[in-house]
Each structure stands twice: as structure tokens, then as C-alpha cells.
């Protein structure tokens, strides 16, 4: 942990003197970006959304092309911290090709209005049916079948949906009413 903190401090000190952008194709630069991302993920998983967001903001400054898709996790952080304005800024950087965006929009709508936005819900059910089934399932086992599927060369959509659930499960334990609202639409 101390190494990560020192590395972060070096990056911050350097960035105060001049603009620093790390090159994705440079091996050591990429390692720094990946380490910063992994640290942000660790903090996200333990519920330290503020530190996760700070690290992801730094990552996006250092890697403006967002090779690691930090915007997605940052949007989850902002929503968890109820930073709606920041969420509104970053959600446009989250690809609509992934279910994450619709889950984020559903959650944001639910937090703001107290109900699920019907347009997003309809798109979620139709376009990302496997994700809808996963997020409304009663159990989400990380069993041998799931592990084999997710580690294969071509993971199934169901395995990817389970992976997203498992990556964000700590959120849904805190905001269970959102998941209950989703389940009520089955």
C-alpha cells in the first residue's frame, strides 16, 4: 500500500509542475495506469467511493483516451456519493454498448425520482436481457461453471452479466431498494 501511495504522490507532484500524460504504448507508463486503476477498483470494492473517485479522476487526467474505461467505475462512484452533477458529466463517456450505462441510468433515475425510468428499463430488458435476468436473480453464485465461463476465450453473455453483478455487488447491498425495484418489474 505504501508503494502505491508513494507512486500516487510522485504523479501528483509531477503533474503540479507540468501537464503529464502517460503514453499507453509505453510499458512502464501503462503499468502505472493499470496500478492506479487497480487501486481505484480495490477502494471501490471496500466502499471507499471518494478515494476511488479521486484515483479515477487522476487516471483520466493521465490517460485522456481512457484506455481502461475508468469513466464507467467513476460514474458508479459518483452515483454512490450522490454527486449528481459530476455523474451527469461523466455518464456521457460511458459507452452505450455496455449494460453498465443502462444500469447507471436506471439507478440514477431511481435515486432522483424514486422510481425506475421506463424507457431505460425497457431498453435494459430488451437489449441486455441476460443482465436484466442476473440483476433480478435471487442468487449470484461464483461457482465453478461461472469461473470456467468467465475465464474462457469467449465468455458467455450470462457470465459477463454475473461478473458485472459481482463487481458492483457492494453497491447493491447498500442500495437494496434499487434492486428490489428492479425485481418488482419481473
Indicate residue ranges for each PLM-predicted region:
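Structural signature of alpha-solenoid helical repeat junctions
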Residues: 24-31, 48, 66, 97
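Long, ordered, amphipathic alpha-helical scaffolds
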Residues: 105-186
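Flexible helix-coil transition and linker loops at the boundaries of alpha-helical arrays
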Residues: 2-28, 60-62
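Alpha-helical repeat scaffolds
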Residues: 1-4, 49-57, 83-95, 115-131, ...
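Residue at a conserved register position within TPR or TPR-like alpha-solenoid repeats
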Residues: 43, 78, 109-110
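Catalytic phosphate/metal-binding cores of nucleic-acid and nucleotide-processing enzymes, i.e., regions
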Residues: 39-48
Amino acid at each position: 500500500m505504501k508503494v502505491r501511495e508513494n507512486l500516487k504522490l510522485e504523479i501528483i507532484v509531477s503533474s503540479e509542475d507540468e501537464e503529464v500524460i502517460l503514453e499507453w504504448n509505453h510499458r512502464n507508463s501503462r503499468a502505472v495506469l493499470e496500478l492506479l486503476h487497480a487501486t481505484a477498483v480495490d477502494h471501490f470494492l471496500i466502499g471507499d467511493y471518494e478515494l476511488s473517485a479521486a484515483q479515477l479522476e487522476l487516471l483520466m487526467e493521465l490517460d485522456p483516451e481512457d484506455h481502461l474505461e475508468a469513466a464507467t467505475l467513476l460514474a458508479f462512484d459518483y452515483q454512490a456519493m450522490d454527486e449528481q452533477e459530476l455523474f451527469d458529466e461523466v455518464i456521457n463517456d460511458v459507452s452505450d454498448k455496455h449494460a453498465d450505462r443502462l444500469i447507471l441510468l436506471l439507478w440514477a433515475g431511481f435515486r432522483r425520482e424514486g422510481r425506475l425510468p421506463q424507457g431505460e428499463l425497457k431498453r435494459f430488458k430488451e437489449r441486455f436481457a441476460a443482465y436484466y435476468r442476473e440483476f433480478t436473480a435471487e442468487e449470484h453464485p461464483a461457482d465453478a461453471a461461472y469461473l470456467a465461463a468467465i475465464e474462457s476465450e469467449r465468455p458467455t453473455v450470462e457470465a459477463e452479466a454475473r461478473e458485472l453483478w459481482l463487481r458492483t455487488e457492494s453497491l447493491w447491498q447498500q442500495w437494496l431498494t434499487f434492486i428490489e425495484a428492479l425485481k418488482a418489474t419481473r
